[in-house]
Swiss-Prot record:
Protein name: Purine permease 21
UniProt subcellular location: Membrane
Main location: membrane
Signal peptide (residue range): none
Transmembrane segments: 44-64, 78-98, 118-138, 140-160, 169-189, 204-224, 241-261, 287-307, 312-332, 336-356
GO terms for MF: purine nucleobase transmembrane transporter activity; purine nucleoside transmembrane transporter activity
Expression tissues: Expressed in mesophyll cells.
Membrane topology designation: Multi-pass membrane protein
Name of a matching Pfam family: PUNUT
Family: Belongs to the purine permeases (TC 2.A.7.14) family.
Residue ranges, annotated region (Disordered): 12-34, 367-390
Length: 390
């Protein structure tokens, strides 16, 4: 008996180190869970960086653009060019990504050069037109009014995302869009004059219409970018984001430069620099940093489209809404009357409504992802017990 017990103990000890299929599956699932958490943290870190780029780039670029007009600048086409011409700062990264991409091509389905070129040309023409309309609005409207009208861009993006990208319009999002629309509509009745430049009623209406048109153009642009990433480009890499910014900006810059020479505004640029109130150096530095900050905004905006959606990218752009009017009051002494305050409150309310909907979507997505992971450990046990019974 004692010998049999010793044999049983030895056999049991020999069996203990042997891992079962269930242990292997649980270890694999555990490593996959850690990997998914790590990827989630990295993703949201990128989202945070892109968000900072959008808010800071948009705010600084808008203030610099108005500073150009306030101190003697008058060229709408030049103001358009500097919004687009800063893309060469991205060329070093672009060349590096091209070298690494040529050695590691994975997909058998590479987008044809013709389709890719068509995407960049269409988006470039659209962004060039939208930037020109934005420059007209910046010339005739106070910065605080302009930024509040630009909040309507979120409503346009939601509409075009619904048509092009199957974006769901929940009651909360519809409430957000309604508030943003009312917020912009109120400013149509705000006949305000800038302190440094007297603006007629006709010029104010022209600036208002052009700003709304620019908001609609940018809303369509963001939705088309998301559609291009999903249907045409089909490659989930950050280098694709940089490529889109560079080629799209190249097309738009060429169109803007043609407009600058066709309108004969280039003839007045030398005298404009001579008579600039802050001096020649400040004139050049204003244009340079305006170009750089708009590219920072473009990187953040396109990156958010790549990581999440065009509607979320636009919502983050609207998050910087209170920043520009406050800076405009401090720097340019814009008047913050009651109508503007009401418009700002409605715009912030609309933005918060949209963020709440995003929170609900993320919560539901996490719950749906947790259901299969909690059920999966039971399956190996059931299979193991059925095999033992056999």
């Amino acid at each position: 008996m004692k010998g049999d017990q010793e044999v049983q103990v030895i056999v049991q000890q020999g069996k203990e180190p042997i891992p079962t299929d269930q242990d292997e599956r649980s270890s694999v699932s555990g490593s996959q869970t850690k990997l998914s958490h790590s990827n989630t943290y990295k993703r949201w870190l990128r989202v945070a960086i892109y968000t900072f780029f959008v808010i800071s780039g948009q705010s600084v670029a808008t203030i610099l653009g108005r500073l150009y007009y306030e101190n003697g600048g008058n060229s709408k086409w030049l103001a358009t060019v500097v919004q687009l011409v800063g893309f060469p700062i991205l060329l070093p990264y672009h060349l590096l990504s091209v070298k690494t991409h040529t050695t590691t091509q994975r997909d058998g389905k590479l987008t044809s050069l013709r389709n890719r070129a068509l995407v960049y040309i269409v988006l470039g023409l659209l962004v060039g037109a939208a930037c020109y309309l934005y420059s007209i609005g910046l010339l005739y409207l106070p910065v605080s009014t302009l930024s509040l009208i630009c909040a309507s861009q979120l409503a346009f993006t939601a509409f075009f995302s619904y048509l092009l990208n199957s974006q769901k319009l929940t009651p909360i999002i519809l409430n957000s869009l309604f508030l943003l629309t009312i917020s912009s509509t109120l400013l149509a009745f705000n006949n305000e004059e800038s302190d440094s430049k007297k603006v007629t009623k006709g010029e104010y209406v022209k600036g208002f219409v052009c700003t709304v048109g620019a908001s609609a153009g940018f809303g369509l642009l963001l939705s088309l970018q998301q559609l291009a990433f999903r249907k045409v480009l089909k490659k989930q890499t950050f280098s694709e984001v940089i490529n889109m910014i560079i080629y799209m900006s190249l097309v738009a810059s060429c169109v803007s430069v043609v407009g600058l020479f066709a309108s004969s505004e280039w003839k007045t640029l030398s005298s404009e620099m001579e008579n600039y109130k802050l001096g020649k150096v400040s004139y050049v530095m204003n244009l340079v940093w305006t170009a750089v900050t708009w590219q920072v905004f473009s990187i953040g905006c396109t990156g958010l489209i790549f990581e999440l959606s065009s509607l979320f990218s636009n919502a983050i752009s609207a998050l910087g809404l209170p920043v520009v009017p406050i800076l405009a009051v401090i720097i340019f002494h814009d008047k913050m009357n009651g109508l503007k305050v009401i418009s700002m409150i409605l715009a912030i309310w609309g933005f918060v409504s949209y963020v709440y909907q995003q929170y609900l979507d993320e919560t539901n997505l996490k719950k749906s992802n947790e259901i299969p992971t909690t059920e999966s450990p039971d399956r190996p046990e059931a299979e193991g017990s059925s095999e033992q019974s056999k």
